[in-house]
């Protein structure tokens, strides 16, 4: 499933989490990650959200897959771009994570003889590269353990968000009501 978490839609605060958008009950939109839209005076003027359109009425499993997919992608984005070490933004791509891990492991195995090692950590707000040279085993170990702790916290936050997500509003709209008289 491809979802662009950076492509948000907007609307009124009264928008439902799911709705049929045609009279034939054949096209549905499901929404998640509602965020307030504020004006210059910090007054809420609407909401933004991520939505997916289905050419049919989606099942609850499809809704859960969509919502969990959004949470997973937001968690990945937070890991990738949210880590700051010593006031320096650090790009935690999978490749960089492997490189940092390997450099720390080799430095540990060689008791620091493999140092110094220089890494491009990320970029500043103007797009200029930010480099750091690790010269001691203690410094690279502190950096690496901080990065691992950050990644673990992001993953735990994502799991907690999924565990606590309330699907009741979706179920009320998408689950047929049965009359057991």
Task: For the regions a language model picked out, list residue spans one by one.
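A preference for well-ordered globular domain cores
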Residues: 2-181
């Amino acid at each position: 499933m491809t979802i662009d978490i950076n492509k948000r839609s907007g609307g009124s605060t009264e928008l439902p989490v799911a709705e049929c958008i045609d009279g034939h009950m054949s096209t549905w939109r499901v929404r998640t990650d509602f965020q307030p839209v504020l004006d210059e005076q910090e007054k809420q003027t609407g909401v933004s959200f991520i939505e997916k359109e289905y050419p049919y009425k989606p099942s609850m499993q499809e809704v859960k897959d969509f919502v969990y997919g959004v949470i997973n992608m937001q968690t990945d984005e937070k890991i990738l771009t949210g880590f700051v070490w010593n006031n320096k933004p650090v790009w935690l791509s999978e490749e960089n994570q492997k490189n940092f891990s390997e450099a720390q492991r080799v430095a540990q195995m060689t008791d620091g003889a493999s140092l110094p090692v220089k890494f491009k950590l990320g970029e500043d707000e103007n797009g200029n590269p930010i480099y750091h040279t690790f010269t001691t085993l203690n410094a690279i170990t502190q950096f690496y353990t901080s990065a691992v702790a950050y990644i673990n916290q992001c993953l735990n936050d994502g799991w907690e968000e999924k565990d606590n997500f309330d699907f009741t509003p979706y179920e009320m709209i998408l689950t047929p009501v049965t009359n057991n008289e």
